Each structure stands twice: as structure tokens, then as C-alpha cells.
Amino acid sequence: MRMSEYFRILQGLPDGPFTRKQAEAVAAQYRNVFIEDDQGTHFRLVVRQDGTLIWRSWNFEDCAGYWMNRYIRDFGILK
């Protein structure tokens, strides 16, 4: 196998607010990360485990990406 087959480079979120494009890229990598409460200009990125809410952040919050990255690291299930 090639080295690239052993390692996957995953896209994370910036520490602060994040864009829809960034959220979609992250959610596409995980089976349990979703965009919810979509209001058009703002939305929540959510981590769930067996349907139970683990963490959620509005995309415009100051430290939204920082906390989402931590919970995704600990609870995210790669596709």
C-alpha cells in the first residue's frame, strides 16, 4: 500500500466562527456530524452519538470551531 492509503488528511474548522462550506466539508467526513437548525445565514453543527446530542455550536459563535473540533476529535465517527 502507498503511504497515502495509511493516512487521511482531515479538514477541521477554524477556532472561531466557520462558514457553511467549511461545515459541509467537515460533516462530509463523519457519520455523526450534521448541519441542523438551518436558518439560511446561520446554522448549527452538531455531533451526535447513537442519536443523543453530544455537542452543538452555532456557526457564528466566537469559539465555535475550537469546541467543535474537540468534540469531533473525541466522538466523531469517520465515514
UniProtKB/Swiss-Prot annotation:
Keyword line: Plasmid
Any Pfam family the entry gives: DUF905
Cell wall biogenesis/degradation in keyword set: no
The keyword Ribonucleoprotein belongs to this UniProt entry's keyword annotation: no
Annotated family: Belongs to the UPF0401 family.
UniProt protein name: UPF0401 protein YubL
Protein's organism: Salmonella typhimurium
